[in-house]
Amino acid sequence: VSARFPGERIVVPAGRLKVRSNDTDYRFRAHSAFAHLTGLGVDHEPDAVLVLEPTDPGAGDDGTDHTATLYFRPLAGRDTEQFYADSRSGEFWIGPRPTLAGLAARTGLRTAGLEELESAITKNVAADGTAVRLLAETDQDVDALLAAVRTEAGVDLAAAAEADAQTAEFLSELRLVKDAWEVERMRASVAATIAGFEDVVRALPRAVGHDRGERVVEGAFFARARLEGNDLGYDTIAASGNNATILHWIRNTGAVRPGELLLLDAGVEDDSLYTADITRTLPVSGTFTDVQRRIYQAVLDAADAAFAIVRPGIRFRELHAEAMRVLVDRLDGWGLLPVSAEVALSDEGQHHRRWMPHGTSHHLGLDVHDCAQAKRELYLDGVLEPGMVFTIEPGLYFKEEDLAVPEDYRGIGVRIEDDILVTEDGAENLSAVLPRTPDEIEAWMARLQA
């Protein structure tokens, strides 16, 4: 960050507590850029702001051009009103808080109280003074403070807004390649997620026949996420029957019926805030019907084809193209396409998108859709590098009202999703130990439910 923005002040807020209802807040979760730069996870630290102050070249931290200071609200003494009366930050209400020295020791950063933040952000701001770059729309108070100072100082507001957008873009791009520690945390997230899938299989008999069986599934996975991680990485999709044809079905209010398929898309967020993102489609009764197996195998073949080409040097977009070639071939073989496979795969065709409308892959890390602000040429058109982690998740979705497919296909949705690490000479499927083939899934479910 220092090398990218020499001579400029960089302001990265963690964010504020968000109200769920009246005086009840959501559990705090810091902005991913803040977590990435500070190494803080779990619920650290509401209202905190990381400020990188420019220095003379080489005079900053570790020979960089900036010094970094973490501003936050530290432990309040028992002789303060805050300790007893502040339900958001008082230790009597929420438990112990870190001291300035404690968080400095933990992060290796300078620390200071929030009372010093305004001066740190606003000093020397002028049209010809210190330029400030802000991770905007993260903390409304910081946004308002800097907007007022920029206006008063005569700073070009359009140029400042563009600089802020570039900063968010760059901070997102920083996460495209994971280091060894990040990969280790993602392995832990994947392991906890796999344990959660096993919990769901054990809970399936209890879900069957319940009016809200999908909630039984959701609850079983959530318990594991809170037991082994910080939280869910995203709202669990527990979609049975026709609900599996709804890409982001998170109401999970449906029943789970014998003979249906259950699409479970879920991930545990580690205490470090790195998350897994895995999907399996399971036969509720423990065995696939012939048509379910046929559709599932087509999706599995597409996923395997995409994985087979993963290696450094190929472009990210090639994964989707490879998976689509397989799915289009299967759809054509089933007689579902109104045109040839060649026409369907053309830019003008895309007829298969009726049944597979989403992308095959997305980056994964601190956000389930990580690096989302990265430039197109580094993401979709980007070249794969060792250390990148992303999903491969093709699917087929045949809605129950879709008269363009045979009746026995209707109401079936299948998605298979794994978390993939690019290595020096290929790739590793981080979630490969979770059964993937129809036979493996049937045997796995039988063993867990025995």
Question: Predicted segment positions?
Answer:
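Active-site neighborhoods and metal-handling regions in enzymes and metal-associated proteins
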Residues: 1-450
